[in-house]
Amino acid sequence: MSRHEGSQGVEKRCHGGEEQVRETKGDGAPNGGYGWVCVAACATINAWVFHFFIFLGVMVGLEEVVADLRRHTWGLNSAYAVFLAYYLANDIFPGASHLSYAFIGGLSISQALIVSPVATLTTRLFGTRTTLLIGVALETISFIGASFASQIWHLFLSQGLCFGYGMGFLFVGSVGISAQWFTTRRSLANGIAAAGSGLGGLIYSLAAQAMIRNIGLPWAFRILAIIAFVVNTTCALIIRDRNKQIGSSQLSFDYRLFKKPQFLGLMVFGFLSMLAYVVLLFSLPNYARTVGMTAQQGSIVGAVLNLGQAMGRPPIGYFSDSFGRLNMASTMTFLAGLFSLVIWMFAKSFGVLVFFAVVGGWVAGTFWAVAAPVTTEIMGLVDLPSALSLTWLVLVLPTTFSEPIGLEIVAYNGGSYTGAILFTGWMYIAAACVLWGVRAWKIGDVEEQAAIAGKRASEVDPVAMVASQGSGGVPEGFTKSPFLKRLVMWQIV
């Protein structure tokens, strides 16, 4: 069987402590057709889910307030800092501390990840469409609530909790859809869907300032609420999952996955990637100011970073389908670290920093472009929802604490970003090394399945034949290649 003929495979699953090996028939994924409609809908949802912080940031240009605020809220991106400056300058929430404001931004991200098991359970009980519509309702309510906020706890409820929960239901409900519709083009489809986040950030960063200037902040939020409701509801209604066709487990917390070392490797890869990604995303515009650039130039750098992500994710997906998803994911993550160490470290001019924002943006968000395809490659489509649900829970820690870590590094170095850049670069490289180890495991698994099927390893589809170690039927005398050899050998996985 070739890599692109994912029609049949062997899958071993655990039930009540017993391992059962069964043959999985092809689920008839069309590799096109209505699947592209679902990809477009997922990209649109991602644009709305992740545009929020970009929108928050282009509200006003109060540089003297922003300069003070940035010293206290380094963890939030400069865009969000400007939004907070709007509240402070207008004395809307007197007595509210800088830390209170800073916590709101991180709260929404952590709540989106924490709610993932609930969203997975909702999908299993009521279906994907219901899960997405719950997210639409929560996100719409959050925008409307923010438009009427007059006390700090209103912001915690609207921008922190409510928006975070809505983001979680929308993201969890849509993140695995693209992978269900494709086999040979799975990574390309997921890359296009993931590109919506970067494209949405770019579009809304350009549109938000005009809305605030012409209609005011409250009505800007209300207009966003209306648009979000209409657009996301439309996407929720046209998205179709294939959970029944593939027999998706949809378990919120399948603890048995933690017994698999390859799954633990994926968790470490995501953990380290997010430590680096959040620091890069939130610090690049601020870094521009520390090397003598204006606030406007810093905002441009942030917008270009989003553009780079939108441009980079589809090509990463496309080449992943040709050269291997694990190969591309580990290589691109390594490049993200390398670019940070050799370009960002020495970027002191606007032109060089824009160049880094473009090339760094291409690879910085590799995890989001490959999360579903790589997890499918390792765990299989059946366990994909459960594996992703656990992944989002694990990512609560790095997305919550990477900001304070970066803040402490910058403060310890007297305001210099050298330490933060080193931290970012080496976390990316460490993540790439861990995933390269998972890749070596996968090569051994492919060798074993090839031996069972009586084929060469290059003829085995690494997705269709998702099996755990120790499956029966291995020919007598068969041994996998040594692990160290698998680390350096070439195999499309």
Can you name each region flagged by the protein language model?
Residues 1-45, 50, 217-252, 377, ...:
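Intracellular terminal tails of multi-pass secondary transporters
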Residues 48, 52-58, 76-87, 260-318, ...:
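Extracytoplasmic gate region of multi-pass secondary transporters
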Residues 87, 160, 167-183, 189-190, ...:
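Intracellular juxtamembrane helix-capping segments at the cytosolic ends
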Residues 291-293, 297, 303-309, 320-374, ...:
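C-terminal transmembrane helical hairpin of 12-TM major facilitator-type secondary transporters
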